Regions:
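Intrinsically disordered, low-complexity terminal regions
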Residues: 2-291
Length: 291
């Protein structure tokens, strides 16, 4: 897991780069271009900076399967923009990008990736991605989202997942079943999982980030700071431990033990046996029964 300070240092740089982009008008008819793909397992999407009116955004990526089994990328955009977007393979990595110094004045850029299975996803520049069933590996999955990027998945069953979000990025899932999970959030990033089944989960949140889930997790380890929020009141757990600091809040439901260190006006809301609480508080922090 990367050190927290790197996330904070990258935020000003990201916005500085965004402000110095040159606006480039693109025209031409909406065109569809297909690019054949070999055997790739990693995806990187970056520097596709788009603007329409007052809104700035990135490319939309959709991963899906069809009966052809043919690995390919299909991009739909104006003919001018298609010429500026690079889709190439570098070893086992599929890289999709454009110029880091340009922002394209257009309504959309959609890229469909067919019959690829990824174990590593790196998105930047406000990229929006939807990963359908069967497009993500079921052993170990690494996800890194930067600069207001987002990833949405339906259901996933796997051994291990490592998620790192920064710069107001987001991760959403309907259902995840796994053994071990690690989530590292900074810069007002957020995670929402409707149904989470896991053995162990490690959470690290900073900079007004948020994590919300329902389900069942055996062991939860949390470190939340900078007005972050962890809402796992609808997650049944046997053991919760960690730290809340800097006006952060944690909502937990436990059936075994809960051991937390609260500081800097942080708040713990809990459901469970109060006799099993082991909580230290300082700096105006508080512990409250959830109702």
């Amino acid at each position: 897991m990367k050190k927290r300070i790197l996330g904070f240092l990258s935020l000003p740089l990201f916005f500085l780069v965004g402000c110095t982009n040159k606006d480039v008008a693109v025209s031409g008819t909406i065109t569809i271009k297909e690019v054949e793909i070999e055997d790739v397992s990693s995806l990187e999407v970056y520097n596709i900076n788009l603007k329409s009116g007052f809104s700035s955004f990135g490319a939309k990526i959709v991963c899906l399967n069809d009966d052809s089994k043919k690995k390919r990328a299909v991009i739909t955009a104006s003919s001018d923009l298609i010429e500026k977007v690079s889709i190439k393979e570098s070893g086992a990595t599929l890289k999709i990008s454009a110029s880091s110094h340009e922002r394209y004045l257009t309504d959309s850029c959609e890229i469909y990736l067919y019959n690829c299975v990824f174990n590593s996803i790196n998105l930047a520049s406000a990229t929006q991605m939807i990963a359908n069933d069967g497009t993500l590996r079921e052993d170990k999955l690494d996800i890194d989202l930067k600069g207001a990027s987002s990833l949405e998945i339906n259901k996933l069953a796997l051994n291990e997942i490592d998620v790192e979000l920064s710069g107001a990025s987001s991760f959403k899932a309907s259902k995840i079943e796994l053994n071990d999970a690690s989530f590292d959030l900074s810069g007002a990033s957020n995670v929402k999982i409707e149904s989470l089944i896991a053995d162990d989960i490690e959470l690290s949140l900073a900079g007004a980030s948020s994590f919300k889930a329902s389900g069942s997790v055996d062991k939860i380890e949390v470190d939340a700071s900078g007005a972050s929020k962890v809402d796992m009141i609808n997650v049944s757990s046997s053991k919760v431990s960690g730290h809340l600091s800097g006006a952060s809040s944690g909502y937990f439901s436990f059936r075994g033990s809960l051991k937390l260190d609260l500081s800097g006006a942080s708040t713990l809301y809990y459901l469970g046996d109060s006799s099993s609480l082991d909580v230290s508080t300082s700096g105006g922090s508080s512990v409250k029964k959830y109702n």
